A protein has these predicted regions:
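Charged, amphipathic alpha-helical segments and their flanking helix caps
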Residues: 1-31, 48-153
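A short, hydrophobic beta-strand-centered structural micro-motif
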Residues: 38-49
């Protein structure tokens, strides 16, 4: 067993959350940036929610994360977003048997209170893989709370 650094732990938590969203939606979920797809989601753990040294349960970090969903069709975007909203609680913590807790260092993965209603879909431009011209598509952002612990593996 080797010590897991803070950055390694954060990366593992981000990957576990993205894979969890993929299992729920069955759709492509990328980490940090859109690779040039008009139908996908991008998950990114952003910043400490309550300060630089914020803690939860004494040794875990509470982060605000975001999920950007991209679709060429606005109705398909709304369906994808509603599926995710229905799958995640807003205020409930992960229970002891949660698959994320068993396979990673994530203690809590839930919708942030600010995501009670779906934000308005907006248009954005994407340069699809293999093309040079921009394509307009719809996007919406959902916020998540992620509480994870930097720990030994």
């Amino acid at each position: 067993m080797k010590p897991c650094t803070y950055i390694e732990s954060l990366s593992k938590a981000e990957t576990a959350c993205a894979e969890h969203i993929h299992r729920i939606t069955g759709e492509s979920v990328h980490i940090a940036e859109n690779p040039g797809l008009t139908d996908c989601a991008v998950f990114d753990i952003g910043y400490l929610q309550t300060g630089e040294h914020a803690t939860f349960k004494a040794s875990a970090y509470h982060f605000r994360a975001k999920l950007d969903i991209y679709r060429r069709n606005r109705q398909n975007l709304q369906v994808a977003a509603m599926r995710i909203l229905e799958s995640f609680p807003i205020n409930a913590d992960c229970n002891e048997a949660d698959v994320l807790r068993e396979s990673s260092n994530v203690h809590v993965f839930r919708l942030a209170p600010q995501t009670q209603g779906l934000s308005e879909a907006t248009t954005t431009s994407i340069v699809p893989i293999g093309r040079t011209d921009q394509v307009k598509c719809w996007t919406v952002t959902l916020l998540f709370d992620v509480v994870f612990q930097a720990r030994f593996e």
